[in-house]
Curated annotation (Swiss-Prot):
Its main location: membrane. Belongs to the MntP (TC 9.B.29) family. It comes from Psychrobacter cryohalolentis (strain ATCC BAA-1226 / DSM 17306 / VKM B-2378 / K5). It comes from the Bacteria. This is Putative manganese efflux pump MntP 1. It is a multi-pass membrane protein. InterPro entries: Mntp/YtaF (IPR003810), Put_MntP (IPR022929). One of its GO terms (molecular function) is manganese ion transmembrane transporter activity. The chain crosses the membrane at residues 8-28, 43-63, 66-86, 123-143, 146-166, 176-196. The keyword Flavoprotein does not apply. Coiled coil: none annotated. Keywords: Cell inner membrane, Cell membrane, Ion transport, Manganese, Membrane, Transmembrane, Transmembrane helix, Transport.
């Protein structure tokens, strides 16, 4: 496996941590629900989070391709800075319980035996905004954007699916740890983009 593929996989795992943490929270909130409901929730989490996390970096990549020509000399600093800021934001959210607050607000209104697609769509978009910003750096990492976005989507879908079951069985104590891991990986990739060419 070459270094570029390792970077794509690490980026995919880091970007999936928001969706993973939200999925753990959704699973934890579903502990009293039927097995059929939890399976449907896991499938929808995989679909919503996977598609959003795959499309948003592609949008960021396309925007980045346009901006890269204008900002060629500053691009590594800008791209690395974006990843470092995203990582720092994930760490901040992990230590301040912001994901739990979003889930509490959503679930207080929607706890029932049917999937609330509006809530799932909103959570998918909210967790994938960071992925759009990270997509800008795909140009700087010299990665195949289509392959990278496909891997990001598949990894996120897997984390979304299994996060539901992990949350159902273990509760919410893993949410913050997933955010911390994702934040640290994004910071490391950002430093690499800035200083190692």
């Amino acid at each position: 496996m070459d270094i570029e593929m390792i970077e794509v996989i690490l980026l995919a795992i880091a970007l999936a941590m928001d969706a993973f943490a939200v999925s753990i929270g959704l699973g934890a909130k579903s502990q009293k629900q039927s097995s059929a409901y939890v399976l449907r929730l896991a499938v929808y989490a995989a679909l919503y989070f996977g598609i959003a996390q795959g499309v948003m970096p592609l949008i960021g990549y396309l925007l980045g391709a346009v901006l890269l020509g204008w900002l060629a000399t500053a691009a590594p600093w800008l791209g690395g800075g974006i990843l470092i800021l995203l990582g720092a934001k994930m760490l901040y959210e992990a230590f301040n319980g912001e994901i739990e607050a979003v889930l509490e607000d959503s679930f207080d209104r929607n706890m029932q035996e049917k999937i609330n697609h509006r809530m799932m769509f909103t959570l998918a978009i909210a967790t994938s905004i960071d992925a759009m910003a990270a997509g800008f750096t795909l140009n700087l990492l010299a990665l195949n954007a289509w392959l990278a976005c496909s891997i990001i989507a598949i990894v996120t879908a897997g984390f979304g699916f299994f996060g539901i079951y992990l949350g159902k069985s273990s509760g919410t104590w893993l949410e913050d740890k997933a955010e911390i891991l994702g934040g640290l990986v994004l910071i490391a990739i950002g430093i690499k983009v800035m200083f190692i060419r």
